[in-house]
Amino acid sequence: VILYGRYKAKINHRLIHNAKKQGKLILVTAISPTPAGEGKTTTSVGLADAMNALGKKTMLCLREPSLGPVFGIKRGAAGGGYAQVGPMNDRQLRFIVDGLGGKVNGTPREDGFDITVASEVMAIFCLATSISDLKERLSRIVCAYTYDGKPVTAGQIGAAGAMTALLKDALDPNLVQTLENNPAIIHGGPFANIAHGCNSVLATKLSLSLADYTITEAGFGADLGAEKFLDIKCRYAGIAPSACVLVATVRALKSHGGVAKADLSQPNLEAVKAGAANLIRHIDNLKNGFGLPVVVAINAFPTDTPEEQAYVEQVCAEQGVPCVLSEVFAKGGEGGKALAEKVLEVMEDRPIQYVYPLEMPLKQKVEAIAKKSTVPTV
């Protein structure tokens, strides 16, 4: 362990190559996301605290949060008073023209910066299994084209070595702790809508080698993040979850039932019934599509009514999956013990039923994902 101050450290990523132990993996995903938020990360943290409270040696393994989306929602979680962040977001750096000094000083061209989580390098970084593998992957990045249309790679222009050197320390996963002093590895974090939306392979495999149980999450809804987690990350890394927690909220079901965001706090059982189709489809994807043991976690809000929560439980029972009320946001690990116990109960090692075989042509892969996994939303 390499210490960085009193509360955080890095773990040597090379430890996974000497690991013989393989713990159980638990995936946390959610129904289709809404502006109201579903609570995947909240549930993941609370579930890890709950399992440790039950005496289970558990590690949390998450992506690094991005400040971009936070500041993009008008300074959410960035303090009050005069806005120093939102209006000063340097979006102009996404569109840059340079080389305007004439023939002697360069060729005019357009370029721009990506935020880290939207970078191709981040996606590559999170799939790398060693520093040599990282260099090989970076060397294949296409950075330009010749005048006759042939691709030019980072390896061909001699940039791969320097890129790898800049990332060598970043390759070591970050060790932090939850509020209940349980270990959490936070490492990497590509967006799920443009990449695979999971934390690094190195971090997950390291956690599996250290703990009996590893809890991780996949970005966005189960049809996007979980699909990529299973079809890309798990297949490449040779891992598979023994259980899947599908997070749902009464508020999100109302949203999928057609209720405006401003009205989600009002009781509306009929809207919950209308939005339940979204939950049912996600359950079917995970249970019958991928063949995973599933537990639905109702992430409780103070505005939920007992009737609304009872209806969600009824829907889950009809689909043949257990449903547990999760109160980890309000009560921490104590509020997640019932969920932890149910996850431990259903846990089972099963082979993943992938959406597509690797040898399938690209167009057919996209069609398979669209037909088998994607969940339409209102």
Question: What do these predicted regions represent?
Answer:
Residues I2-V378:
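Flexible phosphate-sensing "switch/lid" loops adjacent to ATP/NTP-binding sites
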